[in-house]
């Protein structure tokens, strides 16, 4: 199965490693390019070191990115801890679908710091 990963931070890294160790093909990784303060272990850097095609995460906001997914015959798009709103055409482009992996109970704990808010309201 061909997978495209859109992600950030440790959640994105965990999914990157899980897909890399699976029988599935990682067709591309979309993440935020490292800045001057990056520690060198962000998703972009790790994916590049592992040899994966790396693209700016903001591409998912553009309808035309759906054409790239279809051209690659992508089966699944995984969106993990990304701050970008994925364009509807991009969501619908993968053959089997797109999946948003979110650590909070949606819609109540949408956004940032979901775990902290869940504990606060417990």
Q: Residue locations for each model-derived region?
A:
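One-carbon transfer enzymes
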Residues: 1-122
